[in-house]
A protein has these predicted regions:
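C-terminal motif of bacterial Sec signal peptides marking the signal peptidase cleavage site
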Residues: 15-16
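A mature extracytoplasmic/lumenal domain signature
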Residues: 71, 81-82, 107, 112, ...
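Surface-exposed, charged secondary-structure patches
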Residues: 91-134, 235-276
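Short beta-strand edge/turn micro-motifs at domain boundaries
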Residues: 137-168, 276-303
Length: 313
């Protein structure tokens, strides 16, 4: 049920996130093709918000043709039960009935001249296959790209909002700061978003938090269940858990344009509760370096017989 909410959520925000769980076959299928877009005037937050509203209206009216036209062909949606493509979302929403949706804390961040990301909190009312949508707010993110002069949804992800857990007690067995020499030079990043993300996790596994910080843009944003973090908050957050045994899999990359790409993947952290999360990062080219601008984590849902709740679009 939680999934429906997400679905709804996404529709409004980016109407964009869908890839039926298809394994790793097309893991980098979109990363190697050049992206071109017609010149377009700089899009405003009002423009993108209006696009979100149009998407939600299309869902309420069950106008699936309009809804589909507002999504890019390589649209990807990340939910707590998997990653969905455009075809998967179009099939999913046909069982969705939306009666009301409310948004709060909308904020647009520019990725580059041809891509933006809209973040917000969303709560929806309605049904999915006759069952009421779950109550509660979701932290959502929806990315839009300029394709041939049109702004289309390309990515959506939402995470059920929850109160932050109490901080873990300090461990005497582990150093409180980076165990890597400050003289060591961080590995270089490039246009390969998957490779970049692996470099970041290598820094985390070695507790080199200075290196981790060097991979983030000054205005980096992170969305987790307990809220939205800035760069300082992200650096502080990663120092509170042991990433040394993290296992990464199910990689998928989507190229927004020549200066920005999305990578999404599954993280398993033995000993954590929950021990699996779906992570996504948007990498951008800034002043000759590839840096992480945006990151979101969504805990994987417990397996249930018939789960229908977050926004699976």
């Amino acid at each position: 049920m939680k999934k429906i909410l997400v679905l709804v959520c996404f529709l409004v925000g980016a109407a964009a996130c869908a890839t039926e769980p298809s394994g790793n076959k097309d893991m980098m299928s979109n990363a190697n093709r050049p992206m071109e877009s017609k010149p377009a005037a700089m899009v405003s937050e009002a423009d993108i918000t209006a696009k979100d509203v149009a998407i939600w209206d299309a869902l309420k009216k069950k106008d699936y043709d309009v809804f589909g036209r507002l999504l890019a062909s390589d649209y990807t949606e990340v939910e707590d039960d998997g990653v969905y493509d455009k075809a998967g979302i179009l099939a999913y929403v046909k069982d969705l009935e939306i009666s009301d949706v409310t948004f709060a804390n909308r904020k647009m961040m520019r990725i580059d001249k041809d891509a933006v990301i809209l973040t917000y909190d969303v709560t929806a009312k309605g049904t999915y296959k006759g069952q009421a949508l779950p109550t509660g707010a979701y932290h959502a993110a929806a990315a839009y790209v300029n394709r041939d002069g049109q702004w289309l949804g390309i990515y959506y992800q939402q995470t059920l909002a929850k109160a932050a857990p109490p901080p873990p007690p300090p461990s005497k067995a582990e150093p409180s700061k980076s165990s890597t020499s400050p003289m060591s030079k961080p590995a270089e990043t490039g246009p390969d978003a998957e490779a970049n993300e692996k470099v970041v996790w290598a820094a985390l596994k070695s507790r080199n938090y200075d290196a981790f910080a060097s991979y983030l843009t000054p205005d980096a944003m992170e969305i987790e269940a307990d809220g939205v973090l800035d760069k300082a908050g992200s650096v502080k957050g990663v120092s509170t858990f042991d990433a040394s045994k993290a296992e990464l899999s199910e990689w998928k990359t989507v190229k927004f344009d020549n200066a920005a790409s999305l990578v999404t993947y599954l993280v398993k952290l033995p000993g954590m509760k929950p021990d699996q999360e779906r992570h996504s990062t948007i990498w951008v080219s800034r002043d000759g370096r590839w840096l992480a601008l945006f990151h979101q984590g969504t805990p994987v849902a417990a397996t249930t017989p018939a789960k229908s709740g977050t926004r699976k679009m």
